Amino acid sequence: MATTLDNPPISVSKIAIIGAGVSGIAASKQLSHHNPLVFEASDSIGGVWRHCSYNSTKLQSHRRDYEFSDFPWPQRESSEFPTHLEILDYLHSYAEHFDVLKNIRFNSKVVEIRYVGDQEDLSSSFGGLPSDHRTPLPGHPVWEIGVQKNNQSDSIQWYAFEFVVVCIGKYGDIPKIPEFACNKGPDVFKGRVMHTLDYCKLDQEAATKLLEGKKVVVVGFKKSGIDLAMECAKANQGPQGQSCTMVVRTPHWIVPHYRIWGLPFSMFYSTRSSQFLHERPNQGVLKALLCLLLSPVRSGISKFIESYLLRKLPLEKYELKPEHPFEEDYASCQMAIVPENFFSEADKGKIVFKRASNWSFWSGGIEFEDNSKLEADVVVLATGFDGKKKLKSILPRPFCSLLDYPSGLMPLYR
């Protein structure tokens, strides 16, 4: 639905914020003197903590590293790794304390963003960004946002803004689904196939019913897959319980807690001095040289942590030792805290690991590249989300082209 003279864009604020998750409500608080308008597609704040969490989901970072600097966690004696429900309570307390809820329009899904500023301001020297980006508020609207209310796809209201803050995140909304050859996909499987995004929508009773007494296969070995395997093991206790098989292509480093040989984890990666060990974008020649000179120290720290993890966890026993150094997973946020008793359930046979690079479906389960077959009733794809596709779906050109980074990673400010 295009903007026309009969349907001109509404201008109610200078600044728009898309998303009311952690970043969205923080941005709203910081920009409160501009009375920003926040568009949230769902009926509540919280983002992934509300829509992409299991019953057992907990924070992966220490509580003190996740709280807002201007709003300490109210219950200081609570768990160091709060549950997703405790995090939602904290976010609601933050939003109420700083009165940001008044700026949020719920059930308002942004479906398109347009840049309507002077096209001559598009400067190749800034990677295709308009030169206005150096003056955040140019004094006149340069962005138009199309919004659907209450999932009414036939009706789009347009709004005009001087500045837009995109806080929709990388995770949720668009699942990353593997591609399969003809007659090798989910359509030939007689059981149930779902992505973790769909599993998150189940309440505890429905989730237990789905897993209990079923042969479950979880594809993936990152945090969502590990948590799901643990929930499956809990639902299948007793002699009638079935085992859960995790299909692992690339093992990633996992940690039991945030202490290494008795030393706090933050000592290795969260101090001011440790920042000199790691490369950063646009860091300059001198800092790059210093980082190069300190690379043996960086490697030594990584091996020191790996030695602890290999001693503490049975990674080699289950062929789950990663081939890459620990620092790679830490730097790319692919490290996960393993749930308590996870390997105890593996020792009891409730969680089984299967290493495989390629697999496909057959009528009774999944088949591997060596032609071996695994029977299954339920297959859950813990294969992540397509954050790049999610952003490209609303960003206009040339801005969406900035997501196509040579390394394949999504370039973020921090």
Name each model feature, range by range:
Residues 2-16, 20-198, 202, 211, ...:
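N-terminal FAD-binding dinucleotide-binding subdomain shared by FAD-dependent oxidases/monooxygenases
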